[in-house]
């Protein structure tokens, strides 16, 4: 049912240099001394010139919108709305400084805050932007509307030029290139956004050779968020990225998984627990956490590992719950 691929290797570039030698004159004249001093001065001047040029050419670090700590809330204007499906929108919020970047790192999220007009308690929810952390001028959220979800309903009711409060970044799992040999992303619904953030970071870094397997569960095909982006990764990196989709209500002719993410599916597509340096990330609704890995106790407490991953023999250290 699933195909497997061989992994590519990148070829290193080589550089060469040539050295020159000169023969000192036999004359006892002071001319060589003057020449040496002159050349030394020329060398210093050339070094200073080149150093100055290098400094001038080095790109200045862009200002960051979110700096954490005691910064407080940052109010941003909604500048663009894109309808992705019957219940999902992509919302773009612009930064006051067009040259600024978000200041987020991998993996991290932002808090959003909405104050109801009736003066009731503010609604605060975390969201992981889907725009690149190095993108200047704006950030984007992909938001699915949930019944009785006050923040998602508010975001879907917003119009261009209205404003929303943000705060962050909220640190999650610190990533660095090649931290793990193979990672697996098990996601449900909007739990895909931190997974996409992590996968995008891995594949945009040519030094990072991490393999990535995605298992993504949804109700219907229309609910698969960021599918185009993941298909682009599959087409560009077929030897390092695989995606498996599971639907509760699949359409006729669907060739992916059906129903829920099962123990049999995960046993088939995930690396074995005995493999070295692997990590499994889980993010989704409460029911999925309960079935796959067990819930988190708090943002800082991962809780015990239970569910399917425990039954398959994975250890607590091999699993991270967003």
Curated annotation (Swiss-Prot):
Pfam families: FAD_binding_6 (PF00970), NAD_binding_1 (PF00175). Residues 71-176 form the FAD-binding FR-type domain. Its main location: mitochondrion. Its EC number is 1.6.2.2. Its cofactor is FAD. InterPro entries: CBR-like (IPR001834), Cbr1-like_FAD-bd_dom (IPR008333), FAD-bd_FR_type (IPR017927), Flavoprot_Pyr_Nucl_cyt_Rdtase (IPR001709), FNR_nucleotide-bd (IPR039261), OxRdtase_FAD/NAD-bd (IPR001433), Riboflavin_synthase-like_b-brl (IPR017938). GO terms for biological process: ergosterol biosynthetic process. May mediate the reduction of outer membrane cytochrome b5. This is NADH-cytochrome b5 reductase 2. It comes from Emericella nidulans (strain FGSC A4 / ATCC 38163 / CBS 112.46 / NRRL 194 / M139) (Aspergillus nidulans).
């Amino acid at each position: 049912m699933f195909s497997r691929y061989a992994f590519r290797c990148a070829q290193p570039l080589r550089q060469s240099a040539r050295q020159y030698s000169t023969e000192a004159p036999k004359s006892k004249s002071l001319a060589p001394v003057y020449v040496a001093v002159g050349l030394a001065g020329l060398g210093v001047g050339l070094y200073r010139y080149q150093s100055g040029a290098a400094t001038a050419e080095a790109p200045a670090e862009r200002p960051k919108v979110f700096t954490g700590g005691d910064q407080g809330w940052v109010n941003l204007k909604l500048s663009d709305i894109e309808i992705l499906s019957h219940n999902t929108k992509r919302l773009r919020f612009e930064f006051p400084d067009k040259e600024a970047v978000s200041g987020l790192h991998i993996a991290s999220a932002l808090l959003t805050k909405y104050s109801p007009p009736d003066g009731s308690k503010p609604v605060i929810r975390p969201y992981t932007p889907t725009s690149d952390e190095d993108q200047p001028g704006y950030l984007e959220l992909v938001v699915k509307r949930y019944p009785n979800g006050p923040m998602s309903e508010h975001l879907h009711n917003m119009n261009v030029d209205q404003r929303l409060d943000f705060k962050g970044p909220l640190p999650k799992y610190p990533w660095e290139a090649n931290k793990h040999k193979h990672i697996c992303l098990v996601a449900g619904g909007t739990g895909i956004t931190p997974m996409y953030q992590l996968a995008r970071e891995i594949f945009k870094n040519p030094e990072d050779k991490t393999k990535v397997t995605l298992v993504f569960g949804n109700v219907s095909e229309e609910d698969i968020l960021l599918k185009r982006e993941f298909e682009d990764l599959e087409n560009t990196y077929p030897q390092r990225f695989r995606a498996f989709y599971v639907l509760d209500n699949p359409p006729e002719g669907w060739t992916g998984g059906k129903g829920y993410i099962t123990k049999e599916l995960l046993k088939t597509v995930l690396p074995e627990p005995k493999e070295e340096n692997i990590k499994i990330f889980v993010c989704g609704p409460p029911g999925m956490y309960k079935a796959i890995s067990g819930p988190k106790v708090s943002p800082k407490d991962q809780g015990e590992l239970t569910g399917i991953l425990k039954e398959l023999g994975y250890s607590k250290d091999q699993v991270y719950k967003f």
